[in-house]
Each structure stands twice: as C-alpha cells, then as structure tokens.
C-alpha cells in the first residue's frame, strides 16, 4: 500500500534546491533528496524506507547534540576569555567568524598573561606570609619550652603536667575536677597574649625576629612578677606575720601622744562642723520665709491685675451692647427715610399728572 501511494504522488523539484545549506540543515536536505529519489524510483520495499528514516533521524539528533556542545564550549571560552578552538565539527562558519571578530587574539593573550602574573603574585605572597607565621610560632614555642624547662626544684614542666593530669584523672573518678584560680588566670592570659601576637600584621625585615624575642621576654618577666607578688601576698596573709609591730624605747608613747592630739583636733573640727550645720539650717529657714513672702506679694499683684482686667472686660461688653443698639436704631431710621422718600416721589408724580390735563383744556 505504501509503495502504491508513493508511486501515485507526483514529485516536483524544489525552488530552494540551488541554495547553500549549513551543517545543521544537512539532514533536512538529505531527507528531501531521499524523498525525491524515492519518488522517482517506484521500486523499493517499505522496510528499507523506514530504516532510512530512522537512520536519518539518529544522524540529525547526533548533529544537533554536537552543535549544542560546540556552542556551549564557545560560550564558556568567551566567558573566561580563552582562545577558541580552530576547528569544531558541528559549528557553522558564521559563528566562528563572529567569535574571531568580537575577541581579538592580542587582547586574549594580554588578559591571559595578566591573570598568570596575578596568580603568581598571590601564591608567592601567601607562601611568604605562611612561612613568617610558622617561623614566629616555632620561636615562641621554643622560648616557652626554654622558660618552662627551668622548673622549680629541678622538676621539668612535662613531669609536672603529667602529675597534674594523673591527679585530675584520679579525681575525676571520685570527685569533680577543681582548677585553682592561679592556673585559670594564667591560662587565660597566655591565650590572650598568643592571640594578640598572632592577630597583628607580620612586618618584614631582619629586626623583626629580635623584636619578637624582646616581646616574649617581657611577657615572661611580667608573668614571673605577677606570680611573685601573689606568693608574697599569700605569705603575708599567714598568721606568722603580725600587723602590729613591736616597738620599744619610748616610740609607742610618742605615737600615742600624736594620736591623742589628732583625736582632739578631730573633735574640734566636728564641733565646728556641727555649728556650721546649725547656721546653715537657720539661713535655709530664713530663705524659705523670704520666698514665701515674695510669692505672696507676687500673688497679690497678680490678683489686682486680674481684677482690673475683669473690670475692663465688663466695660468693653457694655460698650459693645450700646454700639449694637445704636446701630440697630440707625438702620431703622434709614429704612424710615427711604419709605418717606418713596412716598414723596409718588406724591410728586401724582401732582404732575393732574396738571397736564388742565393745561390741555386751557389750550
């Protein structure tokens, strides 16, 4: 049936057969040619036609995929300013010309060189900074190990730490861990100092490491002084040291006399202070009385002024009433005058009308 239908249909040449076609439309032209040849050749089975159509569809899909991939690669190269490939399988000539016109090769090379230089600078700077940090940390650890190595009574610091860890482990089985206040404060101080040393920017130069060593020695000396001061205060807090010194040879009597004199002077000063306080209270009372008197006088003046204002307001109201009454009377008189004038005009008009017929009869 299919072959009969194909043989019955008349095929004609297309108007667009002479035009050039891109790679994307090759499959369509091949399909058109296939239909043209199939129309000419009346012999052929339906199975061969179906297989040809399927193969053409597969080729078309494959070409479309290749074209999409090539376009995506070109867009990536344009976005990252890379040199595009010289030849691509499914790319059209127009797209390649557009790419070559938009992105010149010299600009691409210059951009690539700039990126390489920046990358090298960044990596070198990071490497130098990491090296300086590592050197500083190693020196600090070495100085701390030196200072802590000179332990008290010939016991090194590592053994002390091990003993403390053992005690803590033994205590943790029976009781909760208790950290002394000194150790806690020292740990906090050391942590803060390490953070301060790490945080600032690392200067460059040969004298930098000498400065770091000086800072470390200063910090260690300050810590030793603090420990010494705490030990001294604890030793003085013991009952062995009495606050009252044992003075002899009449020094106690002299001190007692001086104390008595100072007590007498204090009593005199207290009496003077009490007198001044009494005087201050009297002055305060007088000032309060004066304030009351002034306030009363001001209130009286204000009351008189208010009374005068009330009287003036009442007079004003009376005058306004009189003015309103007079104005009403004036309006009434004006209306009366207008009425009289109108009557007068009417009367005069009547007289003139009477005179006119008399004159006519006389003539």
UniProtKB/Swiss-Prot annotation:
Q: Which InterPro entries match?
A: GKAP1
Q: Which stretches are tagged as biased composition: Basic residues?
A: 160-170
According to the UniProt entry, the coiled-coil residues are 50-79, 249-298, 328-348
Q: Does the keyword Transcription apply?
A: no
- Protein's cellular compartments: Golgi apparatus
GO cellular component terms, A-Z:
Golgi apparatus
Q: Where is this region: Disordered?
A: 17-79, 147-182
Sorted keywords for this record are: Coiled coil, Golgi apparatus
- Single GO BP term: signal transduction
Highest taxon of the source?
Eukaryota
Q: Which cysteines are joined by disulfide bonds?
A: none
Function as written in the Swiss-Prot or TrEMBL entry: May play a role in the regulation of insulin-dependent IRS1 tyrosine phosphorylation in adipocytes.
**Family note:** Belongs to the GKAP1 family.
Protein name listed in UniProt: G kinase-anchoring protein 1-B
Q: Which organism is it from?
A: Xenopus laevis
The gene name reads: gkap1-b
């Amino acid at each position: 049936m299919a072959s009969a239908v194909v043989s019955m249909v008349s095929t004609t040449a297309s108007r667009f057969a002479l035009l050039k076609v891109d790679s994307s439309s090759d499959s369509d032209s091949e399909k058109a040619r296939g239909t043209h040849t199939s129309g000419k050749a009346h012999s052929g089975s339906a199975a061969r036609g179906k297989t040809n159509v399927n193969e053409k569809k597969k080729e078309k899909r494959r070409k479309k995929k290749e074209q999409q991939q090539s376009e995506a690669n070109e867009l990536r190269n344009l976005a990252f300013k890379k040199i595009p490939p010289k030849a691509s399988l499914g790319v059209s000539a127009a797209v390649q010309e557009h790419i070559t016109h938009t992105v010149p090769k010299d600009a691409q090379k210059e951009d690539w060189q700039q990126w390489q230089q920046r990358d090298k600078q960044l990596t070198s700077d990071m490497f130098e900074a990491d090296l300086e940090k590592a050197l500083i940390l190693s020196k600090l650890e070495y100085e701390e190990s030196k200072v802590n190595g000179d332990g008290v009574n010939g016991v090194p610091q590592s053994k002390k730490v091990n003993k403390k860890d053992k005690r803590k482990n033994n205590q943790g089985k029976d009781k909760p861990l208790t950290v002394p206040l000194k150790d806690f404060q020292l740990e906090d101080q050391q942590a803060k100092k390490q953070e301060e040393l790490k945080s600032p920017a690392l200067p460059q130069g040969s004298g930098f490491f000498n400065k770091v060593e000086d800072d470390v020695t200063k910090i260690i000396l300050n810590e030793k002084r603090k420990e010494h001061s705490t030990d001294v205060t604890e030793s003085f807090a013991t009952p062995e040291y009495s606050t009252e010194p044992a003075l002899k040879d009449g020094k106690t009597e002299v001190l007692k006399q001086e104390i008595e004199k100072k007590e007498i002077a204090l009593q005199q000063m207290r009496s003077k202070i009490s007198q001044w306080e009494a005087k201050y209270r009297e002055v305060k009372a007088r000032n309060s009385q004066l304030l009351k008197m002034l306030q009363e006088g001001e209130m009286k003046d204000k009351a008189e002024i208010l009374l005068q204002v009330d009287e003036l307001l009442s007079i004003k109201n009376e005058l306004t009433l009189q003015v309103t009454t007079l104005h009403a009377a004036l309006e009434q008189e004006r209306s009366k005058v207008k009425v009289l004038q109108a009557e007068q005009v009417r009367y005069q008009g009547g007289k003139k009308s009477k005179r006119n017929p008399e004159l006519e009869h006389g003539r």
